[in-house]
Amino acid sequence: MKNSRSAAVRILPYFLLAVALMALSYPVVHAPVTHADDQAVPTIGSMAPDFTLDSQEGKPISLHDFKGKWVVLYFYPKDQTPGCTIEAHAFQRDQAQYEAKNAVVVGVSVDTVESHKEWCAKDGMSFKMLSDADKKVVAMYGSTMTIPQAPQLGTLAARNTFIIDPNGKIVKEFIKVNPQGHSEEVLAWLADNAK
């Protein structure tokens, strides 16, 4: 009895971690997206707020670097979690289609540069993954969230995507994205609208 109780105590932290990771993989529809009262949330037709963040290579990347291209700016909660991996793999798989549409995919989360570097190397992602560790850009884009079941994770990026036209204007928003099939959804929108 004593051994089974101590074994249960030893595995409890792993169980709690597994629950937190499962919560991250669950579509964000079930997690509250929080917006501070003073938080600027861009709208369709407005100029996309510019920013500079470090990429997985540790190099600063600015939104204005992509002027003249369509930008698929997608926010996601956490590197190497199931839902985020599904979404990132699909964006990577479809890179040639994005390039053919003069579009670039840019991922943003609150993970560190080192975390992005490790994940991109492990899973072969070549598009830009930007680190917003201080959470300023996710707030600028109204894309912050918390997971009540995993408060230890703090504020994360909500799974939202913004399509920015070659002039820097927000032309489409996908809010509370389901990672399954999202790249196809974005490509379909670009096929109909990116002329």
Whereabouts are the PLM-identified features?
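N-terminal secretory signal peptides that target proteins for export/translocation
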Residues: M1-V9
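Bacterial N-terminal signal peptides
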Residues: L12-V29
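N-terminal "domain-start" segment that seeds a small globular fold
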Residues: V33-L63
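Short loop/turn microsegments at loop-to-beta-strand junctions
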Residues: A48-P49, W70, A158-N160
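Structural microenvironment flanking redox-active thiols in thiol-disulfide oxidoreductases
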Residues: G83-V137
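Thiol-/selenol-based redox modules, centered on thioredoxin-like
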Residues: L153-K195
